[in-house]
């Protein structure tokens, strides 16, 4: 593997290409530059490069099929390249991109875009380089809910970003989030469920704990609690396919079936439950309804693969039709019924596979399709029969989605022994241990990162998942990653993050190159240098020195800083002293609990813009630990089925996952630029937050800092990008 040169002047290529050779010189886009294709079959992909360069850099490059006039040549090469691979050569005379297939050409285009530099004269340049590249894993995926209607454009930007880092699979959970012509009552019941869940004591989590067992999560964030038209969903699917994605609709079967059972209680395994999460697998009406829904989903997605769900089955063999059947019989019959339906339509099947598993986790407990029972605090009895023996009763060409890989390093070998291929679900690339060993399994095809939240940029980023998208994309693509490279990989993701944020938000930030008129410092002279290059700063007395503004809840006076300038943005370098507990959005967090205070931007005309400061979004604690740990923890890394009886602890092992020392790290890397500084001889972390001024034509007179919490907020620096 050629080591990349990662200095201030070299573009960051991420994921890291397999082979890179930097050369001297550069290619400059001029007035006569053209994009040419070897054959018209490559024309639609070449248009992608043309459109991206125009969108990102405002430069139009003509496209033609006359190879003799080429400056940028795009085509296919059938020999010498691996699947999805490409060869890219850049010299002073031009660029040549050849892909092993259409996907390879698309990924080569993403690398071209990462190489691009717009210089101070406005010319678009590309450093000379030779690259041979291909992915390590064939499945590099993401699991998302259908977005809310108001988030569709942002959802497309998210897809665009995932293509930029060479992800190739989107699993989109459909549920009640797409209109159904045959069954509009499903959409109506879905909207009602989502509204009722918000009003329920404890919200959706309250519903989950309302019965004798821990019910399936409701996924009420799907579709924003509503649904999209078929045309809107089709537009999203077509957009993703145009960027090279396999788009897999997830049509939940058996479990997580609220979208079906709330509209048709007659098919619920427990129709007396006010919120039934599981359908009856012995009722013929179940499949008539499911197949009607699936027909409409297939019509819109036109998929090669469909995910049928089946995770977290916790209500089985309870109703009169099912109670005399074994667990493996019920599970296998349901899987096979859905499998045969899709196979007849030429569609392959993916499923969450844990109910076909039987293993002991690192914490000594049995997991998967084992027998489960318990009595709740009200004395109610609940049981689920064992189902794991169904693994011998279902087709071997079902692709297993394995989210129990974080409980044991043997789950993939168990599936391999039974003849199944799989990929990891709920993957966190930055946290998995021994990826180099586990990824070498012959039956492991890759992984997907899950979101389980509103499909919008803010929520996904706050849950640290944008960071996980990037890190996971890197190690799924590159062949040589191992645990010793974690810190370097994190550093590359941090360096890439500003460009990713601009892509997702559709706007430029001054700190990442979007400012041409320089900066002006209003507090701490070297604020910008510290943020950009990590320059050391020393404060001998944090609370009393002239270099820091400390505003606290016990001070009577607000802190004012003179600006007296027209600015495009204001950049705050700040931090707090105490950490706050991280709660992910799927636990339905109240963000007002994280409100620390804010800034008032005062304009010359007397108007004021308020900037709220939320912990984990705009700033974090100074004593941030940017590391991870691996060891025995009292809690499993993720929510798993609650086991009793024979699930008593029998042995312990080191978890196959690391845990972050700082649970806010991914969020803060996205929303701010973390800055390491020396304060009183100790390394501390400050956070640069850039606020975009909605009224750049109005002069900013001053900035006033205000506290509203019991936290002490420290403002170390303030700068502005001049208009």
Where on the chain are the PLM-derived regions?
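Contiguous, structured surface segment used for ligand recognition
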Residues: 1-138, 146, 603
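Substrate-binding groove of N-acetylhexosamine-processing glycoside hydrolases
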Residues: 6-16, 20-22, 29, 43, ...
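Feature activates predominantly on carbohydrate-active enzymes
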Residues: 40, 79-345, 350
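Flexible loop/turn segments at secondary-structure boundaries
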Residues: 43-44, 149-151, 177-181, 254-260, ...
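A structural signal for short, well-ordered beta-strand segments and their strand-loop junctions
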Residues: 98, 169-173, 248-250, 307-309, ...
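An acidic- and aromatic-residue-enriched active-site/binding cleft used to recognize and process polar
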Residues: 147, 167, 174-177, 185, ...
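Charged, glycine/proline-rich intrinsically disordered loops and linkers
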Residues: 183-223, 362-389, 640-670
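N-terminal/edge-of-domain interface segments
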Residues: 501-723
């Amino acid at each position: 593997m050629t080591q990349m040169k990662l200095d201030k002047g070299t573009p960051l290529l991420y994921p890291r290409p397999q082979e890179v050779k930097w050369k001297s010189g550069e290619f400059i886009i001029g007035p006569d530059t053209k994009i040419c294709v070897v054959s018209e079959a490559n024309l639609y992909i070449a248009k992608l490069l043309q459109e991206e360069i125009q969108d990102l850099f405002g430069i139009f490059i003509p496209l033609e099929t006359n190879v003799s006039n080429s400056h940028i040549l795009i085509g296919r090469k059938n020999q010498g390249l691996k699947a999805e691979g490409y060869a890219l050569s850049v010299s002073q005379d031009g660029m040549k991109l050849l892909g092993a297939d259409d996907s390879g050409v698309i990924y080569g285009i993403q690398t071209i875009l990462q190489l691009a530099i717009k210089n101070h004269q406005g010319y678009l340049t590309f450093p000379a380089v030779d690259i041979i590249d291909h992915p390590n894993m064939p499945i590099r995926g993401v699991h998302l809910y259908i977005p809310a209607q108001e988030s569709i454009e942002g959802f497309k930007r998210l897809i665009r970003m995932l293509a930029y880092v060479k992800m190739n699979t989107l699993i989109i959970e459909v549920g009640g989030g797409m209109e159904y012509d045959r069954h509009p009552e499903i959409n109506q019941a879905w909207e009602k469920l989502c509204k009722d869940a918000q009003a329920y004591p404890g919200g959706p989590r309250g519903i989950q704990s309302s019965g004798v067992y821990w019910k399936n999560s409701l996924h009420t964030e799907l579709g924003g609690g509503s649904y999209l038209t078929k045309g809107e969903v089709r537009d999203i699917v077509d957009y993703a396919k145009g960027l090279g994605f396999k788009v897999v609709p997830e049509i939940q079967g058996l479990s997580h079936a609220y979208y079906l059972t709330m509209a048709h209680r007659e098919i619920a395994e427990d129709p007396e439950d006010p919120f039934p999460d599981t359908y009856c697998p012995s009722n013929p009406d179940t499949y008539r309804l499911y197949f009607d829904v699936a027909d409409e989903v297939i019509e819109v997605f036109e998929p090669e693969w469909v995910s049928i769900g089946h995770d977290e089955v916790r209500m089985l063999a309870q109703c009169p039709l099912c109670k005399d059947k074994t667990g493996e019989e019920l599970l296998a019959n349901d899987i096979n019924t859905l499998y045969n339906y899709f196979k007849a339509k030429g569609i392959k099947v993916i499923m969450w596979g844990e109910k076909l598993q039987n293993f002991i986790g690192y914490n000594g407990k049995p997991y998967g399709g084992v027998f489960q029972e318990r009595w709740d605090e009200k004395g109610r009895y609940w049981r689920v029969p064992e189902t794991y023996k169904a693994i011998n009763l279902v087709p071997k060409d079902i692709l297993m989605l394995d989210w129990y890989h974080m409980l044991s390093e043997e789950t993939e070998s168990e599936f391999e022994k039974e003849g199944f291929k799989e990929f990891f679900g709920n993957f966190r690339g930055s946290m998995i241990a021994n990826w180099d060993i586990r990824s070498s399994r012959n039956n492991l095809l890759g992984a997907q990162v899950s979101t389980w939240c509103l499909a919008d940029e803010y929520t996904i980023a706050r849950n640290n998942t944008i960071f996980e998208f990037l890190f996971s994309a890197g190690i799924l693509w590159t062949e040589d990653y191992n645990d010793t490279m974690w810190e370097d990989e994190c550093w590359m993701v941090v360096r890439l993050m500003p460009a990713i944020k601009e892509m997702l938000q559709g706007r430029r930030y001054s700190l990442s190159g979007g400012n041409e008129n320089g900066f002006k410092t209003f507090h701490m002279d070297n604020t910008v240098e510290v943020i950009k290059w990590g320059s050391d700063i020393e404060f001998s007395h944090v609370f009393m020195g002239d270099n820091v503004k400390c505003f606290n809840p016990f001070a009577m006076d607000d802190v004012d800083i003179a600006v007296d300038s027209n600015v495009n943005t204001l950049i705050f370098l700040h931090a707090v002293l105490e950490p706050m507990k991280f709660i992910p959005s799927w636990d339905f967090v109240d963000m007002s609990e994280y409100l620390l205070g804010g800034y008032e931007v005062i304009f010359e005309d007397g108007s004021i813009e308020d900037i709220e400061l939320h912990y984990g979004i705009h700033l974090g604690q100074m004593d941030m630990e940017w590391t991870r740990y691996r060891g025995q923890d009292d809690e499993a890394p993720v929510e798993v089925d609650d086991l009793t009886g024979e699930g008593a602890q029998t042995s312990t092992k080191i978890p196959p996952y690391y845990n972050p020392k700082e649970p806010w790290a991914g969020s803060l890397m996205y929303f701010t630029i973390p800055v390491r500084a020396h304060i009183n001889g100790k390394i501390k972390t400050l956070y640069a937050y850039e606020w975009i001024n909605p009224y750049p034509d109005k002069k900013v007179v001053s900035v006033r800092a205000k506290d509203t919490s019991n936290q002490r907020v420290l403002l170390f620096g303030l700068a502005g990008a001049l208009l």
